[in-house]
């Protein structure tokens, strides 16, 4: 019996050796993951380590950071940093809508779920670019509704975005995501990924696939950098 247990342990270790945490979660621990024909942008994200078992509430007296991504598929991520632990509480996801339509939704969400809290808004630097039709920017539209949005960086540096999030993921208890932030969870679990290049084994696209999961993850990155 003891020999069988030893063999089982060795077989288990061989199975997971060199595998990404997301692979272990899906294949070995039977955790909720997202299958995709590509490579996750954040393979260190884990349902075990980074998702709260139930929704939690923000700590009073500490501002809530809101990460924003603009465009026709906008996203807002409500989060808070307490003692170097980031907690994502909720999200607002837009569908083929302008900043003019999205901004009131974000303001209403904040007032409903986090009354009395101060908010710090951080948005993609391209949110300062005018729209062809109106010349209004995402920043100016949000300001019209009483929300001052600042850019977390001046040049939208990709390496800075990735390294900032990876630092949080690799820090002990660095990130906790509430279950209600479902789209962000799916994005971090692999929905936000690099596409596999056909006919080139082991090769992936240099940039992540743009889709329903990329926008909330981009908003999350903006919040991490701006609020960090």
Specify the residue positions occupied by each region the protein language model found.
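Short, structured patches in soluble enzyme cores that scaffold and shape functional sites
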Residues: 1, 30-32, 80, 90-92
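ATPase catalytic-site recognition across NTP-hydrolyzing enzymes
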Residues: 2-68
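Generic recognition of flexible, low-complexity loop/linker segments
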Residues: 52-55, 63-66, 76, 107-110, ...
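Residue-level detector of short, conserved catalytic/binding motifs and their immediate flanks
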Residues: 64, 74, 119, 217
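Short beta-strand scaffold segments in enzyme catalytic cores
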Residues: 74-80, 221
